[in-house]
Amino acid sequence: LVGSEMCIRDSLNIDVTVIRNGWHGDTSKMFMVGKTQPHNERLVKVTQECLYKAIEVVKPGAYMGDIGAVIQEHASKNHYSVVEDYCGHGIGQVYHEDPQVLHYGKAGTGLRMEEGLCFTIEPMINQGTKYTKILRDGWTVETQDGRNSAQWEHTLAVTSGGVEVLTQRNDESF
């Protein structure tokens, strides 16, 4: 945190990038500090559901737009907005590479997925508007309306059988 202290009832996103044998991995997870407000817990839960629903559509022959459509639909159904300023990305021996993975959009559009494609899905879901602002430090991002936001992320590989979640945690199953 830049210039602030954690307080009971805050939520925190920890985003971790690793390089192993020349290959990058990228993941993030939300944490609650103490007992949080029910509306913040719900935001974090729905954001995680957005990620999981997006992972379910990943397979050879699917389109990148399918990812954005399912995220946008689930967020909107729960009265949240999807940040459009940031997106997932291709990943491999280069940390950020093509394709861009939008978290909004139309099913059946965009790049068609093929076996071997590796990328991240990392939806940022807001309680209020989708708009964000970058603070003077040039790094910290906040929502324009000051309401809460949540983000979860995984690195994926498209396989012949569907998808492998390369950053799967012990408490998850896909």
Name these PLM-found stretches:
Residues 19-25, 36-112, 118-130:
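Conserved, well-structured core segments that form or line functional sites
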Residues 12-14, 119, 156:
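Generic structural signal for buried aliphatic residues
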Residues 1-8:
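Short, small-residue-biased leader/transition segments that mark boundaries at the very start
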Residues 31, 155-157:
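A structural signal for short hydrophobic beta-strand segments in well-ordered beta-sheet cores
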Residues 9-10, 116:
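Loop/turn positions that initiate beta-strands
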Residues 101-109, 122-152, 173-174:
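A conserved acidic, glycine/proline-rich C-terminal tail/linker
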Residues 20, 158-162:
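Short acidic-glycine loop/turn motifs at beta-strand connectors
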Residues 25-41, 132-147:
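Short, compositionally biased
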